[in-house]
Amino acid sequence: ADTAVGGNFGAFTTNRPAHAAAALGCGWTLIGHCEERNDKAGILAEAGVTDTAAVNRLLNQEVKAAQAAGLKVLYCIGEKSEEQEQWQQVLGDQLSIGLDGADKSRVVIAYEPIWSIGPGKTPADKPYIEKIARFVKEQTGGLDVVYGGGLKADNAAMLASIADIDGGLIALTRFSGEIGFYPEEYLEIIRLYLGH
């Protein structure tokens, strides 16, 4: 569900207010996905806003609106290739600003290594993911962390072996050829993740 802020009355033609999502039976919403962050950063840049924390503040408003409507939040964080040297600062800001004043008991963190997502890119390795997951747990007081950087059949068992990873965010099941989400492949990924 999209958790547009700005109230719950009026025309929201291309947005879905949090209360509308809750009324439809949604229990969770995804906030801060790298694509959403890029969109917001692009709009802010067009408006001349250069404050890098602005996106995190906007997402914080969405988190609070979602929680006020009774939704739980899957909050995405991640660093781009040019941010890897400062990953602790980038991810720390996304967490501290984005979750400021939020009920953390109703939040799960999805980690997206943005620099490694997509066809032809080198996936993040186990030591890197372990380091990030440990950092996120330390920064958030132990919130659940799921991996959102391409959980697929060929890395499901490896990701399941990481003690600080509590699950995965699966948007696609096939990353080459006919890219898409295929239910039978989704079930196979789950089977492999669970070790069955």
Language model regions located:
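Conserved anion-binding
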Residues: 37-121
